[in-house]
Amino acid sequence: MGDAEAGKKIFIQKCAQCHTVEKGGKHKTGPNLWGLFGRKTGQAPGFSYTDANKNKGVIWTEETLMEYLENPKKYIPGTKMIFAGIKKKSEREDLIQYLKEATSS
């Protein structure tokens, strides 16, 4: 799939202001992403989500993240994530590869 090293750079540029990835990492404006894959939307313990996120009921996978990261507000109308999305498929693939490695043991 993607290139995790390139994905890490994308994460630092576009995501790290609001998210952490390490186990036990703190929530910032957005939730800590440890354990993201296989988790339902709106379920990171201790983070205050919008009803839209909690009610979406989707499991985060490579496929759902590909769609979400292209246009978050279209995928989950009512999300408080203020991020326009990543239009380039290759950049989304790189970011997802990085997240797969960085958010699990």
UniProtKB/Swiss-Prot annotation:
It comes from the Eukaryota. It is found in: Mitochondrion intermembrane space. Pfam families: Cytochrom_C. GO terms for cellular component: mitochondrial intermembrane space. PROSITE patterns: CYTC. Its main location: mitochondrion. One of its GO terms (biological process) is mitochondrial electron transport, ubiquinol to cytochrome c. The modification N-acetylglycine is found at residue 2. Keywords: Acetylation, Apoptosis, Electron transport, Heme, Iron, Metal-binding, Mitochondrion, Phosphoprotein, Respiratory chain, Transport. One of its GO terms (molecular function) is metal ion binding. Binds 1 heme c group covalently per subunit. This is one of two isocytochromes C found in the testis. The other is identical with the form found in other rat tissues. These cytochromes are assumed to be located in the sperm. Heme c binds at residues 15, 18-19, 81. Signal peptide: none annotated. Electron carrier protein. The oxidized form of the cytochrome c heme group can accept an electron from the heme group of the cytochrome c1 subunit of cytochrome reductase. Cytochrome c then transfers this electron to the cytochrome oxidase complex, the final protein carrier in the mitochondrial electron-transport chain. Belongs to the cytochrome c family. This is Cytochrome c, testis-specific. The gene is Cyct.
